[in-house]
UniProtKB/Swiss-Prot annotation:
Residues annotated as binding [4Fe-4S] cluster 2: C94, C98, C101
Native source organism of the sequence: Pseudoalteromonas translucida (strain TAC 125)
Residues covered by the Radical SAM core domain: 80-297
Places the protein is found: Cytoplasm
Name assigned to this protein: Lipoyl synthase
Pathway note: Protein modification; protein lipoylation via endogenous pathway; protein N(6)-(lipoyl)lysine from octanoyl-[acyl-carrier-protein]: step 2/2
Cofactor binding note from Swiss-Prot or TrEMBL: Binds 2 [4Fe-4S] clusters per subunit. One cluster is coordinated with 3 cysteines and an exchangeable S-adenosyl-L-methionine.
MF-aspect GO terms: 4 iron, 4 sulfur cluster binding; lipoate synthase activity; metal ion binding
Taxonomy of the source species: Bacteria, Pseudomonadati, Pseudomonadota, Gammaproteobacteria, Alteromonadales
PROSITE patterns referenced in this protein's UniProt entry, alphabetically: RADICAL_SAM (PS51918)
Record SMART domains: Elp3
Main location: cytoplasm
Length: 321
């Protein structure tokens, strides 16, 4: 039997070190085993990086994190170049160790009580009209970090009263009652929680998470605030069948979820789960058509779509691919 790994607070475990701790063994994918990216997945970099560097400097100045950087999002250059970013609160170390995700695992530090104000002032300085706030999983906190979300929402509204706030929350495992009590009292404008994949793949891709629990979180928030949009996201290319994704879409609608994002899974490193298939654009279009047909108010479906990709346009009902 392996001895438990002693984790020091604040130390980030990534790639092989992180994968060594998950219950399902993931073998490294050698370069010759990786699927070749198709032409539709080639990213065009912007000519100027001035705006990108400006946002990175603003983050560093206030000790803030973006999920764009921490999760190695392929859209970072495009979003930063347009002056948008998804802020990640509660540190950059996650208590979970999902093998599709590039965010570091480890023992997080105590939440920074000054972060809500620093975040609000940064958002005000950036003159944002729409902001997405997400977090790592914080299973070490009694409320899963919900109060910190609420504090951030309150501070942002104080400094930017006309802003639209979307929060992308973890599942608050074992703490749903307390977390919802807090967030129902201090709600965002859009409540987002990602199901990520089909339930058959949860043990592989989302160890520690529960499909029905996540659906219930979305349902209960919507029940308390029917006027607020709820949203969820999925990735494809992990070995799921399209019929399984369609079933997830039906489950989301049955739980009154309004908005949907579907994007291609991209392997962050050779130590993460391998890409089983690159889904062609036509299949993304078909998933969007199906989502529209079954009643989503907005569905963004495309290879580069992520939860917060052009989130302002998604919320406004504009087509995003």
């Amino acid at each position: 039997m392996n001895k438990p790994v002693k984790m020091e607070p604040g130390v980030k475990l990534r790639d092989a070190a992180k994968m060594a701790l998950i219950p399902v063994k993931v073998l490294p994918t050698e370069k010759n085993e990786m699927l070749r990216k198709p032409e539709w997945l080639k990213i065009r970099l912007p000519k100027s990086t001035e705006r990108i560097e400006g946002i990175k400097q603003a983050m560093r100045k206030h000790g803030l994190h973006s999920v764009c950087e921490e999760a190695s999002c392929p859209n970072l250059s495009e979003c930063f170049n347009h002056g948008t970013a998804t802020f990640m609160i509660l540190g950059a170390i996650c208590t979970r160790r999902c093998p599709f995700c590039d965010v570091a695992h480890g023992r997080p530090l105590t939440p920074d009580a000054t972060e809500p104000e620093k975040l609000a002032l940064t958002i005000k300085d950036m003159k944002l009209s729409y902001v997405v706030i997400t977090s790592v999983d914080r299973d070490d906190l009694r409320d899963g970090g919900a109060q910190h979300f609420a504090d951030c929402i309150r501070e942002i509204r104080k400094h930017s009263p006309n802003i639209t706030i979307e929060i992308l929350v973890p599942d608050f495992r074992g703490r749903m009652d307390r977390a919802l009590e807090i967030l129902i009292e201090t709600p965002p404008d859009v409540f987002n929680h990602n199901l990520e994949t089909a339930p058959r793949l949860y043990k592989l891709a989302r160890p520690g998470a529960d499909y029905k629990w996540s659906l219930e979180l979305l349902r209960r928030f919507k029940e308390a605030h029917p006027e607020i949009k709820t949203k969820s996201g999925l990735m494809v290319g992990l070995g799921e069948e399209i019929s399984e994704i369609e079933e997830v879409l039906r489950d989301l609608r049955a739980h009154n979820v309004d908005m949907l994002t579907v994007g291609q899974y991209l392997q962050p490193s050779k130590h993460h789960l391998p890409v089983k298939r690159y889904v062609p654009p036509a299949e993304f279009d078909a998933l969007k058509a199906y989502a529209d047909e079954i009643g989503f108010t907005h569905a963004a479906s495309g290879p580069f779509v992520r939860s917060s990709y052009h989130a302002d346009q998604q919320a406004a009902g504009k087509e995003v691919k």
